[in-house]
Design a protein with these regions (language model features):
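C-terminal-of-GTPase-core extension/linker across diverse P-loop GTPases
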Residues: 2-9, 13, 143-265, 282, ...
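Inter-motif core of Ras-like GTPase G domains
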Residues: 287-311
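Switch I (G2) and immediately adjacent beta-strands of P-loop GTPase domains
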Residues: 55-65, 70-74, 254-282, 303
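Glycine-rich, N-terminal phosphate-binding loop of Rossmann-like dinucleotide-binding domains
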Residues: 23-24, 89-91, 241, 276, ...
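Conserved beta-strand segments of alpha/beta enzyme cores
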Residues: 109, 270-272, 371
């Protein structure tokens, strides 16, 4: 337990129904009682029971300010694991500020950003992954991001990491005991058994990393870049997906000369739509800068949409730029034929079916694994299918229901463990010796423990919790 008592306003500034001021520390109860009185008699107020909401009069310097609700949480049954008090005043910046000043006057210290959550971690109420998930919940910009952060807060990530960590410890123990065996005695684990266990660890960790990658995309928002040659309808598609006019649309090539980014929620997922300048050779310096930004955006995109004009056959330049696009990465790329409403039509069972250059052998011969979809940004044809395709590419290595909202630092530690396990597998296969394998196992275990904060430096903790708001 920490010796001092901290206080802060936990609710946002401004007018509202209520404002909440919270305290944590050994003197929370005695400090709160100094500014509270019984509502009718105005006699001295005393907390009697923990976890019971009490009506009290708030007094500062013998002057009544407000009637408040006061609740006391006795250690260790509180968020921080310490004695805590919450005072619920009427909403308003001034009354909350004066209430906080009264607590500080009687011995509380103003809390630092994230200090309540930090104390919960230091008092073993939550581990570091759960502490970071609190920030994920606060900053969630979509329903799925919120759900994935809640899964981490509930301990799902911690449990999966501990399962892998415990398996590593078991293997590590068997190997290190074997190092003490006299030469000639049978080891506790042979190479075949070790390889089998390491492969199982790699599989479990890969599945966990896939869920965490999905969670990272949910947390940060997936970048979906709309690219293509000039005048294929990139800005029209952006406007259609947003269901509002955000980008200027004209028949003049090169209208879009800069990156235009807008957010949209698709199936509960936060998606950043990025409209780019049409790719072509140009002598215009401003347009050329926009084209360079478009290429950079494509390289960093989570999903790449390459638009083509369905109303005409592709020419040599279309094919050339399409091939350059396909050279980037097919895993998250889609060829989108826009303007299908202007394509010729045939009848199939009485229904009009657009016939576009996506059926052209020139396109298909570039790569047999192309994802191709026909749409019309103008009429809305197939936009729902395009959205579904985007979501499927975003969560291709996992599912929305298993995504775990983690930070990039946490993901780095999991990948470090993955690299260690790959090195262990190689070491076992070439029989390099148990000492090296034991060291690699230890490194893998430490990476997992850093995610949970089992061994964390003060510098790391300060870096994490300083990102929280005051009062959290």
């Amino acid at each position: 337990m920490l010796a001092d008592t901290i206080a802060a306003i936990s609710t946002a500034q401004g007018e509202a129904g209520i404002a909440i001021i919270r305290m944590s520390g050994p003197a929370s109860v005695s400090i709160a009682e100094k500014i509270l009185r019984l509502p009718k008699s105005l006699n001295k107020f005393k907390f009697i029971n923990s976890r019971v909401m009490n009506l009290a009069a708030l007094y500062l310097d013998d002057a009544p300010l407000d009637y408040v609700l006061a609740v006391y949480f006795k250690s260790p049954l509180s968020f921080t694991g310490e004695d805590m008090v919450e005072l619920h005043t009427h909403g308003g910046s001034l009354i909350a500020k004066l209430c906080l000043e009264g607590l500080l006057k009687h011995g509380a210290r103003l809390a630092e950003p994230g200090e309540f959550t930090k104390r919960a971690f230091l008092n073993n109420k939550i581990d570091l992954s759960q502490a970071e998930s609190v920030l994920g919940i606060i900053k969630a910009r979509s329903e799925e991001a919120l759900k994935s952060a809640a899964r981490v807060l509930s301990g799902e990530l911690s449990n999966k990491i501990l399962e892998i960590r415990d398996e590593i410890l078991n293997i590590q123990g068997s190997i290190e005991i074997g190092l003490d065996f006299p030469e000639g005695e049978e080891p506790l684990i042979n190479n075949l058994e070790l390889l089998e266990q390491v492969n199982k660890l790699i599989l479990n960790l890969n599945n966990l990393i896939a869920d965490c990658k999905t969670g990272c995309l949910l947390r940060e928002g997936a970048g979906v870049v709309i690219a293509g040659r000039p005048n294929v309808g990139k800005s029209s598609l952006l406007n259609a997906l947003l269901n509002k006019k955000r980008a200027i649309v004209t028949d003049i090539p090169g209208t879009t000369r800069d990156i235009i980014e807008e957010a949209i929620i698709i199936e509960g997922v936060y998606v950043r739509l990025i409209d780019t300048a049409g790719l072509r050779e140009t002598d215009n310096i401003i347009e050329a800068d926009g084209i360079n930004l478009a290429r950079e955006a494509l390289n960093n995109a989570d999903v790449k949409l390459w638009l083509m004009d369905a109303s005409r056959e592709p020419d040599a330049q279309d094919i050339l730029y399409l091939q350059k696009f396909l050279d980037l990465n097919l895993d998250n790329s889609v060829i989108v034929f826009n303007k299908s409403d202007l394509a010729s039509h045939t009848l199939d069972d009485g229904a009009g079916t657009p016939v576009s250059p996506s059926d052209n052998n020139i396109i298909n011969n570039l790569n047999k694994n192309l994802r191709i979809i026909n749409i019309s940004a103008k009429t809305g044809y197939n936009l729902g299918e395009l959205k579904n395709l985007i979501i499927n590419l975003i969560v291709k290595d996992g599912s929305l229901n298993s995504g775990l909202n983690v930070s990039s630092k946490q993901l780095e530690e999991l990948k470090a463990c993955e690299n260690n396990l790959a090195e262990i597998k190689e070491a076992v296969e070439i029989n390099v010796g148990e000492v090296i394998i034991a060291d690699l196992l230890n490194s893998a275990r430490l990476s997992l423990e850093r995610v949970l904060g089992i061994e964390s430096s003060e510098v790391l903790l300060n870096s994490i919790f300083s990102r929280f708001c005051v009062g959290k």
